[in-house]
Amino acid sequence: AILIPLYRAICLSFLGNYAPAAEQGSFDFAYTLAQLVTTIQAGFSTYWGPYVYAHYRTEQERIGRIHDLLNLLIFGFFCLLVMFEDIIFIIFPAKSACLPYFPLMMLAVVFSILCEGTVYGNTIARKPFQDTIGTAVGVAANIAVCAVLVPRFGVMGAAVGLVAANATMF
């Protein structure tokens, strides 16, 4: 849970030094809009997490199939949102400045959601330190990418930094 505000804060810190306030607000809006997808995932996780922990020894094949199906559904939902993103920005015309990098924000969310399955597996295998290492490497990737790209590309560089952080963590 700490990753979401941490990665966001790193991007916004770099944007604070290199981008005007309007671009920072545009980035924050796109990020918040992309995060709405996680509310669906959070509702499902309320059921899925306890089920995985209770049945991982006896239902491994079923858990694996459901996990694969969920990954496919998440990726499909991502594709649909990207395909119909114009409709979102017809509803919010004042926020259309985030249209070029909104797909990157969605991709970062997809990596974050997919990472949750790995977290369950690491906990069951009693290797949660791997999650900590993944988080630390994700933070390092976020800082490095933002340091290189934000001064030159502004908000687009921050969006790439966000994707890099979540992809590295995954």
Model regions: which residues?
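Helix-loop interface residues and adjacent transmembrane-helix termini in multi-pass membrane transporters
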Residues: Y18-A21, I124-R126, R152
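Transmembrane helical elements of multi-pass membrane transporters/channels
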Residues: A1-P50, A108, S112-E116
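Residues that define the loop-to-transmembrane-helix transition and helix capping
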Residues: A22-G25, L99, P128-F129, V155-M156
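Helix-loop junctions and terminal segments of transmembrane helices
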Residues: A30, A34-Q60, G64-N71, V119-I124
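Membrane-interface junctions at transmembrane-helix termini in multi-pass inner-membrane proteins
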Residues: A54, L107-V137
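Alpha-helical transmembrane segments of multi-pass membrane transport and lipid-handling proteins
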Residues: I40-F44, G64-S112, I143-R152
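Residue-level recognition of transmembrane alpha-helices
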Residues: D28-Y31, L70, F102-M105, V109, ...
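Membrane-interface helix-loop junctions in multi-pass transport and translocation proteins
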Residues: F129, A136-F170
